[in-house]
């Protein structure tokens, strides 16, 4: 992100991120505080051990038991105590056929737990290139603890960014990234507008969620105009 900022010649910018991107955006702000003007974040993901366990081992399995069973049963029983490790192993093996089967199961599982939000699930045919790239990136980072020094990296360093104006929207029924993560983050921020969007889930494209995000953008546009006038 910093290389992109430098390439574009931007002094300070507003960062808009969702889901996995919120973790990346928050870490960027922690390291490049002086370059972040404001932030809009949707579906807070802190990438903690608890977050990963909830989605890939237990937690969401109690809400989508049939979908999770398919995700779990692809892995031999002797490896089911650590599904993230088992999928990571298959994603980066030399057997391309096995890799693609594993990625398809992984990807379709994630889509199915968002099914109530009218998410389009690809046919059970060829795996999509976007599914491969996303799965490999996710597994690589999740399995390696995001390459962070500790397992609660963001919250342990959020003090550094507590005075950045941050706008956060999180769906009440977001099962991919839980509301509790947003709540823990917001408790540590001084300049935060936090909206729990009732009836919304993880997708930014539903009517209720997009309405909130558009309002955030309009608010920031007005603030940017005022900043220009005061120069």
Language-model-derived ranges and their functions:
Residues 1-13:
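Conserved acidic catalytic loop of the alpha/beta-hydrolase fold
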Residues 11-50:
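Conserved hydrolase catalytic core segment
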Residues 34-86, 212:
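A catalytic-pocket lid/entrance helix-loop region that shapes and gates access to the active site
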Residues 161-162, 168-170:
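Short beta-strand/loop motif that positions the catalytic acidic residue
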Residues 192-231:
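Catalytic active-site module of serine/aspartate enzymes centered on a nucleophile-bearing elbow/loop
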